[in-house]
Amino acid sequence: MEYPKITIEELVDVTSSKRIFMNDYVDNGVPFYRGKEIILKNKNDIIKEQLYISENKFYEIKQKYGTPKEGDILITAVGTLGVPYLVKNDDVFYFKDGNCIWLRNPITILVNQFLYFFFLTDTFNGILRSIEIGASQKAIT
């Protein structure tokens, strides 16, 4: 049996976040994650060096562009490549643009669950190795 080939964009929206600047960081507020925090979330580890943006900034972004919601997937795209995180129901955070690829608005919730588990496979990691760029700091774009 031969299966049709489709692009990931036919299943989900592939995007990233809006730019957050250092002067947007605050002492308390909504967690702001970079790639290393996404890796920690993937491992269910504690984030010790937490960054934050204000609730006002977060809700402004949420109203205009959307924020990660349950079932979305973030994949690290700089440094340690290809680590997926499946956003949970109680997650409230934003993330650094360029550090993660954001898969959202799947055609069904099962699509993201399937993709998440596929991203954990050696097959996916082999695909990433074939498209990564950079010598000292690996990246996918």
Which stretches of residues belong to each language-model region?
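Non-catalytic DNA-recognition/assembly elements of restriction-modification systems
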Residues: M1-M22, D27
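Structural motif
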Residues: G71-I73
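Short, charged beta-turn/beta-strand-edge "cap" motif at the junction between a beta-strand
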Residues: G79-V83
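Glycine- and charge-enriched low-complexity intrinsically disordered segments
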Residues: N112-S130
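A short glycine-rich beta-alpha junction/loop motif
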Residues: A77, F93-I101, Q113, E132-T141
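Short, solvent-exposed loop/turn positions at domain surfaces
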Residues: R19-I20, Y59-K62, N89, G134
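Short, surface-exposed loop/turn microsegments at beta-strand edges and helix-strand junctions
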Residues: N23-F32, N44-I53, Y65-K69, Y85-G98, ...
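Hydrophobic pocket-lining residues within nucleotide cofactor-binding pockets
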Residues: I38
